[in-house]
Each structure stands twice: as structure tokens, then as C-alpha cells.
């Protein structure tokens, strides 16, 4: 059996909004399509997570003896978001995303290095 760990934000949590923008989890429905005797999935995705939160989760799992054959990583939606209230208050100011591009790249690379060492 292969062990797969999933790290990411709400996209990898299989979270989908309905017409009223209420979020629903669909991971059990998706996983039911795959034979459980071949793949064991541990989903560590968190709603609202950024790449920094992901690195913390990977480091925590590694310290506890992470046993993954594969890891799926997907961050960026929350990292690239902006403080929209600040933008509305001062549209002419220099506004940056929650995570700057270089910080995102370095943090993702650190996450991959932790996983490679496992």
C-alpha cells in the first residue's frame, strides 16, 4: 500500500462553495473512487492555509516520523491574496500580497527539502 500525504489549502481539502457561498467538503466522495487497499491518504490540507503554515505542518509531521511514499502540495491562493480592507481605505498605497513571491518560493523549497529527507 502507498502512503500519500496532502498539504494545501481549501482546494486540496476538496472544499467547494454552493450557490449561497457556503462551503462543503467533498473529499470522502472523491476518495471513494479509489481502492483503499492500494492507497492510504492523509489529508493535512487546511482552509485558509498559507505556504508558511504548510511548512510548519510538514516539519511537525517529519518530526513525528512521516512515512509518505508521495506528497501532494498546493498552496498559493491565500498567499497571493491581499488585504482588501486596506486597499479600499487607501487605493493609491503600495499593497503587497500576504506572502511575497520570493518568500513563497523559499518556503516551498524548504518544504520540499524536508520531504526529500524523509
Stretches found by the model and what they are:
Residues 1-47, 60-67:
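Serine-esterase "nucleophile elbow" of acetyl-processing enzymes
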Residues 11-12, 49, 77-80:
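Short, solvent-exposed loop/turn segments at secondary-structure junctions
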Residues 15-16, 52, 82:
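Short N-terminal helix/helix-N-cap motif within the alpha/beta-hydrolase-1
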Residues 21-22, 48, 52, 102-106:
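Conserved phosphate-coordination/catalytic loops
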Residues 56-118:
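Alpha-helical cap/lid subdomain in secreted, periplasmic
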Amino acid at each position: 500500500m502507498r502512503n500519500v500525504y496532502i498539504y494545501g489549502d481549501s482546494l486540496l481539502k476538496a472544499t467547494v462553495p454552493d450557490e449561497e457561498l457556503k462551503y462543503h467538503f467533498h473529499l470522502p466522495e472523491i476518495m471513494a473512487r479509489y481502492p483503499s487497499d492500494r492507497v492510504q491518504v492523509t489529508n493535512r490540507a487546511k482552509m485558509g492555509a498559507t505556504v508558511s503554515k504548510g511548512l510548519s505542518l510538514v516539519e511537525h509531521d517529519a518530526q513525528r516520523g512521516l512515512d509518505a511514499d508521495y506528497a501532494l502540495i498546493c498552496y498559493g491562493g491565500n498567499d497571493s491574496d491581499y488585504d482588501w480592507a486596506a486597499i479600499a481605505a487607501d487605493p493609491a498605497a503600495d499593497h503587497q500580497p500576504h506572502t511575497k513571491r520570493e518568500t513563497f518560493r523559499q518556503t516551498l523549497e524548504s518544504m520540499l527539502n524536508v520531504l526529500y529527507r524523509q
